[in-house]
């Protein structure tokens, strides 16, 4: 069975590499003069994919290889589109990808010893709130939200990393407590984070945090009624923001009638829809569209660019890949006998799912657009690095499950006292991490 899985993963890896090869060869001929730099960039991208694959295979022998290949494909699509739009930005994105892999490796190390996360959750919570408070005074405004910090001329978005920290903090707290009344502190933390994001006018991130919290709350407690009450409270908050913030009312009005304000505020939505329509089912071809007519074509509206040049069918395929990543992440969570690992996997899966839904739904005019990025695809270092950290969480959870299953099979065959001590330094007698081995999530 293992050999069949390896063959399947090898085929997916080959398909990802073939896509990168074909796309960059096409880009090298898309200009009037042959672009040799496209082939060099192609070699770097393919090397990055192979290095990531080998690192995960070496460090996490029981990790989710298919998920890793799906993430690599999304990153490759992003790099192809960025190079087609602006080769300088594509190089920056490649550097961000390398940093993201390092961040993923850091998460792998932290998740190996989640007992450390228990001790760090309070300092991490204080730091998260402190950073968001600091943004109120030193934050730079971009796209209507005051959520950027500039250090040595480099802009980054702290809220992207607060999202990851929130998952780990909530998982650490909720893994010890399942009664609703004992979850007051993590709830206050989540509410504080969401409120600070609303004050910064980063409503997309606030919505994202709220949905992730509700997912983790339900996974921890199983209280559907209380979760629905929380969802209703979030809905009430969203309604209140409509009446409080002028830019929210304008955004909703533009979403409802983009053609009525085509020459002004509705231009972005209209251009995005026209780009998707002009691409048709199979696309205009890589390099043949007019993506620069769309505002924010490298970030918020990159999905419209993908559909214009690769087609609606390809766009649906991208959505299917997100869905498959989320399903595999949720299955990893459900299969774990460790509450912390399970909640981390649920939180990471929910974050990817909601973020992809919000941005793609906004581009296709299903919901009002909010300024968040398309996971693993949009241009931006903060988002890509944070998404790779989420990938690290999911890979660690899958590897943990595989190792625990291997230990159980060994114990069944040879007995529990026959020297299988691979996990003794990180797990208790029941195979779960020391502080969270009470039972299943």
PLM feature spans:
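A juxtamembrane structural motif centered on a specific transmembrane helix
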Residues: 1-5, 22-26, 359-441
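N-terminal membrane topogenic signal
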Residues: 1-17, 63
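Re-entrant/interfacial helical elements at transmembrane boundaries that shape
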Residues: 149, 208-209, 271, 287-293, ...
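Transmembrane helix-loop junctions at the membrane interface of multipass transporters and ion channels
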Residues: 22-32, 86
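Hydrophobic alpha-helical transmembrane segments of multi-pass inner membrane proteins, especially
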Residues: 35-265, 307-362, 389, 393, ...
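Glycine/serine-rich anion-binding loops at beta->alpha junctions
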Residues: 153-162, 199-201, 280, 284, ...
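Membrane-interface alpha-helices at helix entry/exit sites of multi-pass transporters
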Residues: 4-7, 159, 182-185, 269, ...
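TM-adjacent membrane-interface loops and short helices in multi-pass inner/ER membrane proteins
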Residues: 258-299, 303, 312-314
